[in-house]
Amino acid sequence: MPGDDDVPRPTFNATRAVTVVARPEQIWPWLIQIGVGRAGWYSYDWLDNLGRHSAERIIPEFQHLAVGDVMPMSPDGKHGNVVKAVEPNRWMLWGDQAGQATWYWGLYPADERHTRLITRVRMRYRWTSPLALFNPLVEFTDIAMMRKCLLGIKRRAEASTRCRHRTGRDVVSHLSG
């Protein structure tokens, strides 16, 4: 997958996936607006988003993503991942500034109505860092947090798709304006 060569011998490697009843272009708007100070993580808001609810609508100002953009990972914006590559409606790759971690998000059409949403995190722990004790916590919480995040994206994308089919209107433009 994109980014695998950037972290060739990761200490932590986790690939998660969910099938979404929607096309990649219907999922993409939810995916690229993800993050702190953006639409949230669609996960446990009390933990991931400091109690602020994740968005239930497409937010127009977060619909453009370019290589070099920083995806904040902390509320103060001091920690973040840089967008390393992006293929709209297909995939995006983030990486940390130290070159020790990548986070990949991909959309793979399964058939005319279904898409596999896949995310992969690869990182090399820095055991000499003052944050070294945080590393085991990442492994312990990652599966629950990512499951909730993926299911949150799935729920939103499928609801938008159902609404679009029911009303015949483009939900993205309806919700954003």
Regions found by a protein language model. Give the residues of each.
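Glycine-rich portal/gate segments that line the openings of hydrophobic small-molecule binding cavities
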Residues: 1-8, 19-21, 25, 32-104, ...
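Short glycine-enriched loop/turn motifs at secondary-structure junctions
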Residues: 9-14
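Acidic, Ser/Thr-rich low-complexity intrinsically disordered segments
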Residues: 171-177
